[in-house]
Amino acid sequence: MTEPLILQPAKPADACVIWLHGLGADRYDFLPVAEALQETLLSTRFVLPQAPTRPVTINGGYEMPSWYDIKAMSPARSISLEELETSAKTVTDLIETQQRTGIDTSRIFLAGFSQGGAVVFHTAFKKWEGPLGGVIALSTYAPTFDNDLQLSASQQRIPTLCLHGQYDEVVQNAMGRSAYEHLKGRGVTVTWQEYPMGHEVLPQEIHDIGAWLAERLR
């Protein structure tokens, strides 16, 4: 497996953001974003993992970086749950690696765009047991959230920021909103923010993420 990019901060690291890219992208996709955020988050390490390359059914079996296979797009995503679980294990391993460097998990954040965000949702609220600094979910959905979703006390305490485009044609706004509602209904401190955009990232969005992180790392 390709090793993640690791961006060391200007000061000794006392916090970490693990940031997952989307379908067909790679570990370099959010490198400029991480570099921009580190200009103000001076003691925050960024870890940018790389999804394995695998055939993706909705793209005619074409091989590309993908955290899991997507078998159908509508009305809801049909995915490989086995591959999602494997990717979630990759993320929990990264959390534990950062923990071994001396960073408390209450200062470790999981962020993900699109498919990467779906892995982050599953990891934080279905797999990881323990504190986390927070979750940042960009233009994404939660394929394993349903009405039977049950959260532990520590999972309920994970602050979450959901950001989505009003005109997203890839992951419809309603899909992101559904994940937000699932968490809100279970007592999670979750924030929903919309932007006049499609399936993309805007400078204002990155500014808002930086402010949200800074507030939690004071």
Curated annotation (Swiss-Prot):
Q: Does the keyword Hydrolase apply?
A: yes
User: What are the positions of the active site?
Assistant: S114, D168, H199
The record ties this protein, via Pfam families, to: Abhydrolase_2
| Annotated EC | 3.1.1.1
Q: What keywords are annotated for this sequence in UniProt?
A: Hydrolase, Serine esterase
Q: Does the keyword Hydrolase apply?
A: yes
What's one GO MF term for it? carboxylesterase activity
Q: Which reaction does it catalyse?
A: a carboxylic ester + H2O = an alcohol + a carboxylate + H(+)
Q: What is the enzyme's class at the highest EC level?
A: hydrolase
What is the purpose of this protein?
Hydrolyzes carboxylic ester bonds with relatively broad substrate specificity.
| Family stated for the protein in its record | Belongs to the AB hydrolase superfamily. AB hydrolase 2 family.
| Name of the protein in its database record | Carboxylesterase 1
Please give the organism: Pseudomonas fluorescens
Q: What is the lineage of its organism?
A: Bacteria, Pseudomonadati, Pseudomonadota, Gammaproteobacteria, Pseudomonadales
Q: What gene, per UniProt, encodes this protein?
A: estA
